[in-house]
Design a protein with these regions (language model features):
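Active-site and adjacent substrate-binding regions of carbohydrate-active enzymes
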Residues: 2-613
Length: 613
């Protein structure tokens, strides 16, 4: 039954006269909401920047710190409160900077420490806080610590990394210490010829894991990776792979989940280990002295109670964590890419969002809201539609509305605010894709299937849908050459071909653009932070596979959010959540604000006094 009907009007108590263009400020006036004083990071929106791809200031084809500096006014115009800059430290760039060779220096193509200090100061002058990526589960194999560690078994830093002797079969064949599989494929163990032992790497062989059980090593990490930058004025860290510092010390074999594979998924043995909370308490003592916030990356942790141990205020561990329930929707069960495009249903997505939202209900914890980052493909391509320009805009606005109404600290990734989408299927996986994870997976499929054409086709389709490369292409600033990202003849990574129409400059002139809508929603979220940022989340009609309806409740007020996840018009009957005559239309993704059926990828929000229970 459409919401223009008598039945629907009775169910929702929505005045039929509310069909005019949405007034983004009306909620603050009509709902008489308040904004309670809280730590700055709880109400914040954080804008994530991938330095290599954001803006090139010197024409070498690679983004840099001065490029970020040049666009601070644009970032300020979005209405965000902080920026999170992905690793800008010195690095061989095997894993795009997540392999750090010197925490106290900047990767030369990005700039210098002095450039970083200027960027921090300029951001602060605009009221923008600065977060850096803290990557301390591992270093690069080029880091001086590892170079010393591998030089001999007697070196004082030998125990700063995790070394183990080989195992040998009856016939004398050398084997690694266990069967754990790396996050990027293959064994987690790499043989060192010089010292005749294996070292552990949960990611690339060029990213050896630090031994957090060594106290001297830990304190060197705190000084070099944390205090060095906190002393230069940063406001906090996004903490990479924060739950991997403490491993099961027995290094037993992982359960065999796939008998056809030599190496097995072992996250249960290297995540959330026995000393994790001891280590984080040490870190927190330092961070607290600087009044710095933290957001931890917490993969492979579906257990709510384990997550709460990290983010409960009384535990004094982390300010918040990224849970991966939402962004993992549609992934393969064992291997991320062992799936097919759009392998998900709306009820499954609803469940994932519900789990992350309800983390803070009845607890002293805090959560995050996000659908994109440097490790995820574009949300419109995954959860909306990029089939046409019209559908891209509609679904981009719908997802923006949804995210802006979710509780927790909101994170927006560069390009998300203009509705950037995945690179097209015409891109060559072996040429245009640059990410180590993409390349490793494709080569794994080719080797396993002996180059089977259909298997390669399936792998390419999966990468086109889920690869990290889609987040790492250059930012689309204008319709100029290379999307205005660089004046170089060729950028470090190919620009997506749709930049002529999909870019910042074009959208800044268009009041109906995805960019304009994101700006409006972020202001709306700020004005109504108690309800939209801190309100309790209630899921309605879980089984509906086309429409997502949820309610936010705070202090006797409710917001009802309805989202059409299809390109079709859908009749919609809202649940009765408001007192009679109390509901008012807050916002719609369609400018005309019409009532009636939910149109293609439409999102609407109503607000009012909650119905007495």
């Amino acid at each position: 039954m459409a919401d223009t009907s008598t039945r629907a009007q009775a169910a929702t108590n929505l005045p039929s006269s509310l069909t005019s263009t949405p007034n983004y400020s009306s909620f603050a006036e009509t709902a008489e909401m308040t904004i309670t004083e809280r730590p700055w990071w709880k109400n914040a929106t954080v804008y994530q920047i991938y330095p290599a791809s954001f803006k090139d200031s010197n024409g070498d084809g690679v983004g840099d710190l001065n490029g970020i500096l040049s666009e601070l006014d644009y970032i300020k115009s979005l209405g965000v409160d902080a920026i999170w800059i992905c690793p800008m430290y010195d690095s061989p760039q095997v894993d795009m900077g997540y392999d750090i060779s010197d925490y106290e220096n900047v990767y030369p193509p990005y700039g210098t420490v002095a450039d970083m200090e200027r960027l921090i100061a300029a951001a602060h002058d605009l009221g923008i806080r600065v977060l850096l990526d803290l990557v301390i589960n591992h270093t690069s194999d080029r880091h001086k610590w590892f170079q010393e560690s591998r030089s001999s078994k007697d070196n004082p830093k030998r125990d700063w990394y995790i070394w183990r002797p080989a195992k040998y079969d009856a016939d004398g064949t050398r084997r690694p210490p266990n069967n754990w599989r790396s996050n990027f494929g293959g064994s987690v163990w790499e043989w060192d010829e010089l010292t005749q032992e294996y070292f552990l790497h949960l990611f690339c062989p060029e990213q050896p894991d630090l031994n957090w059980d060594n106290e001297t090593c830990r304190h060197a990490i705190y000084d070099s990776a944390m205090r060095f930058w906190l002393d230069r004025g940063i406001d906090g860290f996004r903490v990479d792979t924060v739950n991997m510092y403490s491993k099961d010390p027995s290094f037993i074999d992982a359960p065999i989940l796939d008998p056809s594979e030599q190496w097995q998924m072992a996250a249960g043995l290297y995540c959330n280990g026995p000393r994790m909370h001891e280590f984080l308490s040490e870190m927190n003592a330092i961070l607290t002295s600087y009044n710095a916030m933290t957001v931890g990356e917490c993969p492979h942790t579906p257990d709510r109670n384990k997550v709460l141990k990290y983010v409960s205020a009384k535990e004094r561990q982390l300010s918040m964590v990224f849970q991966f329930d939402v962004v993992d929707v549609g992934f393969g069960q064992d291997l991320k890419y062992d799936t097919f495009p759009r392998n998900w249903t709306l009820p499954v997505l609803k469940d994932a969002i519900t789990r992350t939202q309800q983390l803070i209900q009845g607890t002293d914890a805090w959560t995050t809201a996000f659908m994109e980052n440097h490790d995820q493909a574009r949300s419109i391509s995954r959860f909306g539609s990029d089939k046409t320009e019209e559908l891209r805009v509609k679904s981009g606005k719908m997802l923006a509305l949804m995210l802006a109404c979710l509780s927790g600290t909101l994170f927006v990734y560069q390009g998300q605010e203009i509705g950037m989408v995945n690179a097209p299927a015409t891109w060559d996986v072996e040429v245009d894709y640059k990410d180590v994870e993409s390349g490793n997976y494709y080569r794994y499929v080719v080797a396993k299937t002996k180059g089977d054409a259909e298997a390669k086709k399936r792998a390419a389709a999966s990468l086109q849908h889920l690869a990290r490369d889609h987040a790492r292409v250059p930012m689309q600033w204008s319709d100029a050459a290379n999307a205005g990202f660089t004046i170089a003849k060729e950028p470090w990574m190919r620009v997506v071909d749709n930049y002529k129409k999909l870019n910042v400059k074009t959208q800044e002139k268009d009041e109906g653009s995805v960019l304009a809508f994101w700006k409006a929603m972020l202001q709306l979220r700020k004005r109504n932070a108690d309800l939209l940022v801190h309100g309790d989340f209630v899921l309605h009609v879980r089984e509906d596979d086309k429409v997502f309806v949820f309610e936010k409740k705070f202090g006797g007020q409710s917001a009802l959010v309805a989202l059409n996840f299809t390109e079709d018009e859908i009749n919609f009957e809202a649940p009765a959540v408001f007192e009679a005559g109390e509901a008012k239309r807050l916002v719609s993704t369609y400018e005309d604000g019409k009532a009636g059926p939910l149109r293609s990828f439409e999102g609407r929000v109503w607000v009012g006094r909650s119905k007495a229970s």
